[in-house]
């Protein structure tokens, strides 16, 4: 979604379950307006929060005109049983879909031997015969134009819902908090990022400088997590602050 929009709307990290909320991205072109909804990943991990994340993903899917499943091609190559093991509910739901379905096998830029993609594509075709499969790279843009053409060709005809310069329905305050949370996920180790949340307490726009000073609070799930998030002499916190500022 970020690649299509040419801007950061949804945060991205290598850690699973980074996305906690439905994030909209609006792509406006002369011939079409596409509203993407990025959702939490569908998985079978236990726990109340994980169940809430998956429920949010299902709710977003029910309201869409088209279903786009994005798979990590690199992880899929290393664990070919991922469909049966982790994505069984999604496998069943998509197989029963009557709406258009596209499956994007992402990160194909990591496949130096492109012939290794073919068995994966065959497995996906067998699992989802009702879907169009697209090998893509969100990093390099490889394969993205055909996928977008597929999406636009199957959207219902309707007037544009948003101004052409609007990229999302997400408030800027929320987006700022998400960017800080992204840096937490990147900087903090192991499970610690999953026990943190970010709130924006002060937002002051300075028209003269063009800058917006932000006072953000990082909430830690446990008392000992606070020190770990700060780091020695606050070095960890300073690094996260700097990374968020230059984003």
Q: What positions do the PLM features span?
A:
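Conserved G1/Walker A P-loop phosphate-binding module
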Residues: 1-71, 212-220
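Conserved nucleotide-binding/hydrolysis micro-motifs of P-loop NTPases
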Residues: 16-18, 40-43, 73-77, 108-111, ...
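Amphipathic helical hotspot of TIR/SEFIR-family domains
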Residues: 79-95, 200-204
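Canonical P-loop GTPase G-domain recognition
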Residues: 95, 99-102, 109-174
């Amino acid at each position: 979604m970020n690649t299509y929009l040419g801007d950061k709307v949804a945060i991205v990290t290598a850690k699973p379950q980074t996305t906690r909320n439905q994030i909209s991205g609006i792509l406006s072109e002369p011939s079409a307006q596409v509203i993407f909804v990025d959702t939490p990943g569908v998985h079978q991990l236990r726990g109340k929060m994980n169940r809430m994340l998956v429920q949010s993903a299902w709710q977003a899917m029910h309201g869409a005109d088209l279903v786009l499943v994005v798979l990590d091609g690199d992880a899929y190559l290393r664990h070919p049983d991922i469909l049966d093991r982790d994505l069984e509910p999604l496998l069943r739901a998509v197989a029963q879909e009557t709406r258009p379905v596209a499956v994007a096998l992402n990160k194909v830029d990591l496949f130096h031997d492109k012939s290794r993609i073919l068995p994966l594509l065959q497995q996906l075709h067998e699992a989802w015969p009702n879907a169009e499969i697209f090998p893509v790279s969100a990093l390099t843009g490889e394969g993205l134009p055909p996928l977008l053409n597929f999406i636009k060709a199957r959207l219902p005809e309707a007037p544009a819902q948003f101004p052409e310069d609007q990229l999302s329905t997400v408030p800027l305050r929320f987006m700022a908090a998400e960017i800080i949370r992204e840096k937490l996920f990147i900087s903090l180790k192991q499970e610690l990022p999953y026990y943190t949340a970010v709130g924006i307490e002060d937002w002051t726009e300075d028209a003269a400088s063009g800058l917006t000073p932000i006072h953000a609070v990082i909430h830690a799930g446990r008392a000992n997590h606070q020190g770990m998030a700060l780091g020695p002499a606050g070095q960890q916190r300073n690094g996260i602050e700097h990374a968020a500022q230059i984003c």
